[in-house]
Protein backbone atom coordinates (compact mmCIF):
# COMPACT_ATOMS: atom_id res chain seq x y z
CA UNK A 1 0.00 0.00 0.00
CA UNK A 2 1.28 3.48 -0.86
CA UNK A 3 2.18 5.62 2.16
CA UNK A 4 0.63 8.97 1.29
CA UNK A 5 1.21 12.35 2.94
CA UNK A 6 -2.43 12.47 4.03
CA UNK A 7 -2.08 9.08 5.74
CA UNK A 8 1.01 10.30 7.60
CA UNK A 9 -0.84 13.49 8.57
CA UNK A 10 -3.81 11.53 9.89
CA UNK A 11 -1.56 9.30 11.99
CA UNK A 12 0.27 12.35 13.38
CA UNK A 13 -3.04 13.90 14.42
CA UNK A 14 -4.13 10.69 16.10
CA UNK A 15 -0.91 10.01 17.97
CA UNK A 16 1.00 13.29 18.26
CA UNK A 17 4.15 11.49 17.10
CA UNK A 18 6.72 13.01 14.72
CA UNK A 19 6.38 12.86 10.94
CA UNK A 20 9.28 10.46 10.38
CA UNK A 21 8.09 8.18 13.19
CA UNK A 22 4.60 8.07 11.66
CA UNK A 23 5.95 7.28 8.22
CA UNK A 24 8.12 4.49 9.62
CA UNK A 25 5.16 3.08 11.56
CA UNK A 26 3.03 2.99 8.42
CA UNK A 27 5.79 1.30 6.42
CA UNK A 28 6.31 -1.29 9.17
CA UNK A 29 2.57 -2.03 9.22
CA UNK A 30 1.85 -2.00 5.47
CA UNK A 31 -0.16 1.22 5.65
CA UNK A 32 -2.61 -0.07 8.28
CA UNK A 33 -3.24 3.09 10.30
CA UNK A 34 -4.72 1.30 13.32
CA UNK A 35 -1.80 -1.12 13.49
CA UNK A 36 0.61 1.79 12.98
CA UNK A 37 -1.01 3.71 15.85
CA UNK A 38 -0.63 0.67 18.09
CA UNK A 39 2.97 0.24 16.93
CA UNK A 40 3.71 3.88 17.83
CA UNK A 41 2.01 3.48 21.17
CA UNK A 42 4.15 0.48 21.97
CA UNK A 43 7.18 2.50 20.96
CA UNK A 44 5.94 5.32 23.17
CA UNK A 45 5.54 2.97 26.10
CA UNK A 46 9.11 1.83 25.65
CA UNK A 47 10.24 5.44 25.77
CA UNK A 48 8.12 6.00 28.84
CA UNK A 49 9.86 3.17 30.68
CA UNK A 50 13.26 4.74 30.03
CA UNK A 51 12.06 7.99 31.59
CA UNK A 52 10.53 6.39 34.66
CA UNK A 53 13.54 6.99 36.93
CA UNK A 54 13.71 10.73 36.36
CA UNK A 55 12.62 13.05 39.15
CA UNK A 56 9.23 14.63 38.43
CA UNK A 57 9.02 17.57 40.85
CA UNK A 58 7.17 20.20 38.81
CA UNK A 59 3.57 19.87 37.69
CA UNK A 60 0.07 20.97 38.54
CA UNK A 61 -2.71 20.60 41.08
CA UNK A 62 -6.09 20.05 39.43
CA UNK A 63 -9.55 19.84 40.94
CA UNK A 64 -13.00 18.57 40.05
CA UNK A 65 -16.20 18.98 42.03
CA UNK A 66 -19.86 18.02 41.96
CA UNK A 67 -21.82 19.39 44.92
CA UNK A 68 -20.35 18.14 48.18
CA UNK A 69 -18.00 15.76 46.40
CA UNK A 70 -14.61 17.20 45.44
CA UNK A 71 -11.11 15.97 44.64
CA UNK A 72 -7.60 17.35 44.26
CA UNK A 73 -4.95 15.56 42.23
CA UNK A 74 -1.24 16.30 41.93
CA UNK A 75 0.29 15.38 38.59
CA UNK A 76 4.04 15.90 38.29
CA UNK A 77 6.34 16.62 35.37
CA UNK A 78 10.11 17.04 35.27
CA UNK A 79 10.09 20.68 34.12
CA UNK A 80 7.93 23.76 34.45
CA UNK A 81 7.95 24.00 30.65
CA UNK A 82 6.05 20.72 30.26
CA UNK A 83 3.79 21.67 33.19
CA UNK A 84 2.43 24.40 30.89
CA UNK A 85 2.12 22.15 27.83
CA UNK A 86 -1.45 21.74 26.54
CA UNK A 87 -1.13 17.94 26.40
CA UNK A 88 -0.05 17.88 30.05
CA UNK A 89 -2.76 20.31 31.15
CA UNK A 90 -5.43 18.29 29.36
CA UNK A 91 -4.16 15.13 31.06
CA UNK A 92 -4.43 16.71 34.52
CA UNK A 93 -8.07 17.58 33.83
CA UNK A 94 -8.74 14.02 32.66
CA UNK A 95 -7.17 12.67 35.86
CA UNK A 96 -9.17 15.02 38.11
CA UNK A 97 -12.48 14.17 36.46
CA UNK A 98 -11.72 10.44 36.48
CA UNK A 99 -10.90 10.68 40.19
CA UNK A 100 -14.17 12.49 40.91
CA UNK A 101 -16.21 9.88 39.07
CA UNK A 102 -14.47 6.92 40.68
CA UNK A 103 -14.19 5.62 44.23
CA UNK A 104 -10.36 5.56 44.09
CA UNK A 105 -8.99 6.37 47.54
CA UNK A 106 -5.46 7.28 46.46
CA UNK A 107 -3.19 7.79 43.45
CA UNK A 108 -2.23 4.11 43.30
CA UNK A 109 -5.87 3.03 43.00
CA UNK A 110 -6.47 5.77 40.44
CA UNK A 111 -3.98 4.21 38.01
CA UNK A 112 -6.37 1.40 37.11
CA UNK A 113 -9.46 3.59 36.70
CA UNK A 114 -10.82 3.33 33.15
CA UNK A 115 -11.63 6.33 30.98
CA UNK A 116 -14.48 6.55 28.46
CA UNK A 117 -11.92 5.68 25.76
CA UNK A 118 -11.33 2.32 27.42
CA UNK A 119 -7.81 3.26 28.50
CA UNK A 120 -6.74 3.26 32.11
CA UNK A 121 -5.23 6.38 33.67
CA UNK A 122 -1.86 4.58 33.64
CA UNK A 123 -2.14 3.86 29.92
CA UNK A 124 -3.09 7.46 29.17
CA UNK A 125 -0.15 8.65 31.29
CA UNK A 126 2.26 6.56 29.20
CA UNK A 127 0.77 7.93 25.98
CA UNK A 128 1.19 11.53 27.19
CA UNK A 129 4.78 10.78 28.24
CA UNK A 130 5.47 9.70 24.66
CA UNK A 131 4.11 13.05 23.44
CA UNK A 132 5.82 15.42 25.87
CA UNK A 133 9.09 13.52 26.29
CA UNK A 134 9.24 13.70 30.09
CA UNK A 135 8.45 11.44 32.99
CA UNK A 136 5.01 12.22 34.44
CA UNK A 137 3.60 10.94 37.70
CA UNK A 138 0.09 10.94 39.13
CA UNK A 139 1.40 11.39 42.63
CA UNK A 140 -1.44 12.23 45.00
CA UNK A 141 -5.21 12.19 45.27
CA UNK A 142 -7.28 13.59 48.13
CA UNK A 143 -11.04 13.79 48.31
CA UNK A 144 -13.93 14.99 50.44
CA UNK A 145 -17.48 13.69 50.04
CA UNK A 146 -19.96 15.30 52.42
CA UNK A 147 -23.46 16.71 52.81
CA UNK A 148 -21.85 19.82 54.36
CA UNK A 149 -20.50 22.81 52.43
CA UNK A 150 -17.42 21.73 50.48
CA UNK A 151 -15.16 24.24 48.73
CA UNK A 152 -12.36 23.47 46.29
CA UNK A 153 -9.76 26.14 45.53
CA UNK A 154 -6.64 26.01 43.36
CA UNK A 155 -4.15 28.88 43.30
CA UNK A 156 -2.11 29.20 40.12
CA UNK A 157 -2.15 25.46 39.54
CA UNK A 158 0.47 25.13 42.30
CA UNK A 159 -1.56 24.90 45.52
CA UNK A 160 -4.92 23.24 46.01
CA UNK A 161 -7.26 23.13 49.01
CA UNK A 162 -10.46 21.28 49.91
CA UNK A 163 -12.50 22.45 52.92
CA UNK A 164 -15.51 20.90 54.61
CA UNK A 165 -17.58 23.45 56.53
CA UNK A 166 -20.59 22.54 58.68
CA UNK A 167 -23.01 25.45 58.66
CA UNK A 168 -22.26 28.85 57.17
CA UNK A 169 -22.28 29.00 53.37
CA UNK A 170 -20.15 28.10 50.37
CA UNK A 171 -18.69 31.62 50.16
CA UNK A 172 -17.28 31.32 53.68
CA UNK A 173 -15.95 27.85 52.86
CA UNK A 174 -14.22 29.25 49.77
CA UNK A 175 -12.74 32.14 51.75
CA UNK A 176 -11.33 29.69 54.29
CA UNK A 177 -9.90 27.58 51.46
CA UNK A 178 -8.11 30.68 50.14
CA UNK A 179 -6.77 31.35 53.64
CA UNK A 180 -5.43 27.80 53.95
CA UNK A 181 -3.76 28.08 50.54
CA UNK A 182 -1.98 31.25 51.67
CA UNK A 183 -1.13 30.42 55.29
CA UNK A 184 -0.71 26.62 55.26
CA UNK A 185 -1.87 25.83 58.82
CA UNK A 186 -1.02 22.24 59.85
CA UNK A 187 -4.09 21.84 62.10
CA UNK A 188 -7.69 23.05 62.39
CA UNK A 189 -7.81 23.92 66.10
CA UNK A 190 -5.77 23.77 69.31
CA UNK A 191 -7.11 20.37 70.36
CA UNK A 192 -5.69 18.90 67.12
CA UNK A 193 -2.12 19.91 67.97
CA UNK A 194 -0.14 16.86 69.20
CA UNK A 195 0.79 16.88 72.90
CA UNK A 196 4.36 15.98 71.93
CA UNK A 197 4.64 19.20 69.91
CA UNK A 198 3.38 21.31 72.82
CA UNK A 199 5.74 19.59 75.29
CA UNK A 200 8.71 20.16 72.99
CA UNK A 201 7.84 23.83 72.54
CA UNK A 202 7.61 24.23 76.33
CA UNK A 203 11.09 22.76 76.64
CA UNK A 204 12.42 25.17 74.04
CA UNK A 205 10.76 28.23 75.58
CA UNK A 206 12.05 27.30 79.03
CA UNK A 207 15.58 26.86 77.69
CA UNK A 208 15.41 30.30 76.03
CA UNK A 209 14.44 32.06 79.27
CA UNK A 210 16.95 34.04 81.28
CA UNK A 211 18.05 32.84 84.71
CA UNK A 212 16.23 35.84 86.17
CA UNK A 213 12.92 34.74 84.64
CA UNK A 214 13.50 31.12 85.67
CA UNK A 215 13.89 32.28 89.28
CA UNK A 216 10.36 33.69 89.34
CA UNK A 217 7.60 31.92 91.32
CA UNK A 218 6.29 28.76 89.66
CA UNK A 219 2.82 30.18 88.97
CA UNK A 220 4.26 33.30 87.30
CA UNK A 221 6.68 31.16 85.29
CA UNK A 222 3.81 28.93 84.16
CA UNK A 223 1.81 31.97 82.99
CA UNK A 224 4.76 33.25 80.96
CA UNK A 225 5.34 29.84 79.33
CA UNK A 226 1.60 29.33 78.70
CA UNK A 227 1.36 32.71 76.98
CA UNK A 228 4.23 31.84 74.66
CA UNK A 229 2.79 28.38 73.90
CA UNK A 230 -0.65 29.86 73.20
CA UNK A 231 0.91 32.18 70.62
CA UNK A 232 2.75 29.27 68.97
CA UNK A 233 -0.41 27.13 68.89
CA UNK A 234 -2.32 29.98 67.25
CA UNK A 235 0.35 30.15 64.55
CA UNK A 236 0.01 26.45 63.68
CA UNK A 237 -3.80 26.24 63.74
CA UNK A 238 -6.33 27.49 61.22
CA UNK A 239 -8.62 28.79 63.96
CA UNK A 240 -5.83 30.74 65.68
CA UNK A 241 -4.60 32.61 62.60
CA UNK A 242 -5.79 36.10 61.58
CA UNK A 243 -8.26 35.60 58.72
CA UNK A 244 -6.60 36.76 55.48
CA UNK A 245 -9.87 38.20 54.15
CA UNK A 246 -10.40 40.21 57.35
CA UNK A 247 -7.33 40.45 59.58
CA UNK A 248 -9.34 42.17 62.34
CA UNK A 249 -10.62 38.73 63.33
CA UNK A 250 -9.26 35.22 63.56
CA UNK A 251 -10.56 32.42 61.36
CA UNK A 252 -12.29 30.98 64.44
CA UNK A 253 -14.11 34.24 65.04
CA UNK A 254 -15.21 34.43 61.39
CA UNK A 255 -16.44 30.83 61.48
CA UNK A 256 -18.28 31.15 64.79
CA UNK A 257 -19.91 34.42 63.71
CA UNK A 258 -21.53 32.43 60.90
CA UNK A 259 -22.59 29.65 63.27
CA UNK A 260 -20.27 27.29 61.43
CA UNK A 261 -17.49 24.79 62.11
CA UNK A 262 -14.55 23.65 59.99
CA UNK A 263 -14.70 19.85 59.97
CA UNK A 264 -11.53 19.18 57.97
CA UNK A 265 -9.36 20.36 55.14
CA UNK A 266 -6.85 18.98 52.67
CA UNK A 267 -4.01 21.01 51.14
CA UNK A 268 -1.62 19.98 48.36
CA UNK A 269 1.31 21.92 46.94
CA UNK A 270 3.18 20.84 43.82
CA UNK A 271 6.37 18.94 44.55
CA UNK A 272 6.24 19.16 48.35
CA UNK A 273 8.32 16.37 49.84
CA UNK A 274 10.13 15.62 46.58
CA UNK A 275 13.88 16.13 46.62
CA UNK A 276 14.73 18.01 43.45
CA UNK A 277 17.89 17.01 41.62
CA UNK A 278 20.26 19.92 41.12
CA UNK A 279 22.49 19.24 38.14
CA UNK A 280 26.17 20.11 38.55
CA UNK A 281 27.47 19.61 35.04
CA UNK A 282 31.01 20.74 35.86
CA UNK A 283 31.30 18.14 38.62
CA UNK A 284 29.81 15.49 36.33
CA UNK A 285 32.36 16.21 33.59
CA UNK A 286 35.23 16.15 36.10
CA UNK A 287 34.00 12.84 37.49
CA UNK A 288 33.80 11.30 34.03
CA UNK A 289 37.28 12.60 33.28
CA UNK A 290 38.61 11.03 36.48
CA UNK A 291 39.44 14.43 37.98
CA UNK A 292 37.06 14.25 40.93
From Swiss-Prot:
Q: Where in the cell is it found?
A: Cytoplasm
Q: Name one GO cellular component term.
A: cytoplasm
Tell me any Pfam family this protein matches: EF_TS
Q: What does this protein do?
A: Associates with the EF-Tu.GDP complex and induces the exchange of GDP to GTP. It remains bound to the aminoacyl-tRNA.EF-Tu.GTP complex up to the GTP hydrolysis stage on the ribosome.
NCBIfam families from the UniProt entry = tsf (TIGR00116)
**Homology family:** Belongs to the EF-Ts family.
Provide the protein name: Elongation factor Ts
Source organism per entry reads: Xanthomonas oryzae pv. oryzae (strain KACC10331 / KXO85)
Amino acid sequence: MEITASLVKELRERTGAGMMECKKALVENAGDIDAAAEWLRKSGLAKADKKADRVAAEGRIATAQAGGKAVLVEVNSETDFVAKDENFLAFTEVVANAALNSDAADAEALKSVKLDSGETIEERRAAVIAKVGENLQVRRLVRIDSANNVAAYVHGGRIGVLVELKGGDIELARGIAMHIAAMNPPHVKASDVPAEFVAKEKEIELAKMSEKDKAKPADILEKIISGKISKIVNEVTLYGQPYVLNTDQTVEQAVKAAGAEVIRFQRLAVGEGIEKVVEDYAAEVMKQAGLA
